[in-house]
Amino acid sequence: MQSNQVNLNLLLRRNWQKIEALQINLRHLNSVRFHMKESFGHRMAKCMLCHLLWQKGHFFVTEHPINGSVCDVLDLNTFIVYEVEAEATPSRIKRKLDDYRHPLIEDLIIIDLRKMGLSWEPLLDVRDAIDKASGLRFTEREA
């Protein structure tokens, strides 16, 4: 835990001007936040991406506004925006590139779920088991 605090202090010292200029609320640091219209697959991919960043010792924010658009994940160590897309069409990719063009953003990485050919069924089974054990009783099975 202490090394994580040291890493955070270094991050803040090195990147404070960028963090301040982008109006990043550190209250939501390393917290995964969702947009209400995101699909189950989108939310799971975002969670996994954030987990991978966290494992690498990176700090991130989610659902952060940049140029009037809201990005899925912003890595505060690299200032790379990650966007999870169900269908990354050429026009959609161009729009994302335009949306997140900002002098403080280093890059944009689009994770196209369609190209990955993933099946969320195993995770849905885990969700259903947790649902049953917790008593939450979700009735729909969304994919």
Region locations from a protein language model:
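Interdomain/boundary linker segments immediately adjacent to catalytic/signaling cores
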Residues: 1-48
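Intrinsic disorder/low-complexity detector
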Residues: 1-13, 130-143
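Metal-dependent nuclease catalytic cores that hydrolyze phosphodiester bonds in DNA/RNA
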Residues: 37-65
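Catalytic cores of nucleic-acid endonucleases
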Residues: 47, 86-142
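Alpha-helix C-cap/termination motif
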Residues: 52-56, 76, 102-106
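Acidic-residue sensor for enzyme active/binding pockets
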Residues: 63, 83-85
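Short coil/turn segments at the loop-to-beta-strand junctions that recur within blades
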Residues: 67-68, 90
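Active-site beta-strand-loop-beta-strand hairpin of nuclease catalytic cores
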Residues: 68-82, 101
